[in-house]
Amino acid sequence: MSVRRTLITISAVSLAVVAGVLIAPKIGEVGHTWTRVSAGDKTWLLAAVGLEVLSFVGYVVLFRAVFVRTESRIDWRESYQITMAGLADTRLLAAGGAGGVALTAWALKRSGMNGRTVTQRMTSFLVILYGVYMAALFVDGAGLATGLFGVHASAAVTIVPAAFGGIVIVSALLMARLRPVSVAPAAAGDERGFRRRARHITLSIAAGVRGALELLRRREVGLVGAIAWWGFDIAVLWASFHAFGAAPPVAAIVMGYFVGTLANTLPLPGGVGGVDGGMIGAFLAFGVDPATAVLAVLSYRAIAFWLPTLPGLVAYFQLRRTVGDWKAEDAAVEPEPVPVAAPARVAIA
């Protein structure tokens, strides 16, 4: 396990443990949780389902804006299959979405996109998606810390997230200035494996950031899909709160959502336990009623986990069939080898 991965895991586990310590004394107040979840306001819960569908639509729109820029085999049907299969993989395996990224890259390569383009566009896709994430952490955290949103909470859920988001954004913009440098063959051979991989990853991220900035400069309309993806998913949590009573201020919901989803980096099935505990712990820090927080988060997680998972599994098998069709098409158009006549022998008298 890499140092970065170890640090992320330690941080996420710590967050879940702290959240558990905060929640444990309150569990008795929740009572029959699952019974109460099923007794939530059906209108608000149905609205939450609709909002989650809109979140998926935003994801597909962003996917097409980044990956499908010219004539391509990937139409809306294939875009749906790739994104839904990737989302199901992410929900089931968590681990920061690594499984979904790998599946998406596999499908793109099978469509005929070369590996370098897949890597660059995948990095740009993630930069745009998580750029919105970090910007929300910074803006919401700064607004909460300064009292701009009229909500008061500890620095752990205001200043710290804002600082983290700001540092990541600035670091990404600085990395965009990095360019590949020619390395002499001898020097390249002497470069250690870890250092070589680190340089490759850094330059790949830098290229991805530049690609994302180029899409922004071109005012690519489809980039609003990133805002729709996060915004409508947060709205699902907001609707879930309303299903069980009053919702806390929007600024608190946004921060609780993003702090909780940091636990999705844990290699747990669907992030079970980590995300739930992180979100509930954050809402307790904002003074939200413990019983309402638990019910709202459990309802949100049920909708956000199962709604893409079942269709996503179906989409995965559809995608396998689509990839098989692509392979058959490629085989059909490959030119047959032309037999080369053997050189004529010349008899010398």
Features from the language model and the residues they span:
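Transmembrane helix-loop junction
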Residues: 68-69, 91, 110, 242-243, ...
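Structured inter-helical modules in multipass membrane proteins
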Residues: 104-107, 213
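Hydrophobic alpha-helical transmembrane segments in multi-pass integral membrane proteins
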Residues: 267-271, 277-301
